[in-house]
């Protein structure tokens, strides 16, 4: 088991968790993998990778992104599958100035696992809450 949505103190004002404490806690819980998905930034990636190696756990590197499609908010977590995916996350994080377009998310999602993420305030959550199958289906088609 692994938590696939973990923010660190590099997600300013969103998490007080220091990377080493996060890794040690996950290891104490018996996890062999630890995931980092800071919000719109990747400043902690190198430190995270080095600490994971130091503590003999497998790093999963990701990015939490706010996006806009048809003037509606969407929220995603992208996890790098390989080095190319990691490079794409670096590129995406370097252009983020608030929300990024859905097209930019799609462009840089290659070689990444894409998850929806929400605090219940994005459009995808509204589609689910209102069981709007037509809009859900259309959205899934866009993501293919």
Positions of predicted regions on the chain:
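Phosphodiester-processing cores and adjacent nucleic acid-binding clamps
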Residues: 1-144
